[in-house]
């Protein structure tokens, strides 16, 4: 699986994730504004954090 792994407004970067079948994009707000985190897998999240998990290469743009 190949997933995007940059945070928020950083330039796009990708990561190869051997053995993974998902990519994710998490979104939440704090004192800095809206934070977006991307990576491999499909982690569980705390209340108030949005999560999008997908199953194709680079699907978490």
From Swiss-Prot:
It holds the Pfam family Toxin_cobra-type. Its main location: secreted. Keywords: Acetylcholine receptor inhibiting toxin, Disulfide bond, Ion channel impairing toxin, Neurotoxin, Postsynaptic neurotoxin, Secreted, Toxin. Gene3D superfamilies: CD59. GO terms for molecular function: acetylcholine receptor inhibitor activity; ion channel regulator activity; toxin activity. Expressed by the venom gland. The keyword DNA-binding does not apply. PROSITE patterns: SNAKE_TOXIN. InterPro entries: Snake_3FTx, Snake_toxin-like_sf, Snake_toxin_con_site, Toxin_cobra-type. GO terms for cellular component: extracellular region. Disulfide bonds join 3-23, 17-40, 42-53, 54-59. It is found in: Secreted. Belongs to the three-finger toxin family. Short-chain subfamily. Type I alpha-neurotoxin sub-subfamily. Binds to muscle nicotinic acetylcholine receptor (nAChR) and inhibit acetylcholine from binding to the receptor, thereby impairing neuromuscular transmission. This is Short neurotoxin 2. It comes from Naja annulifera.
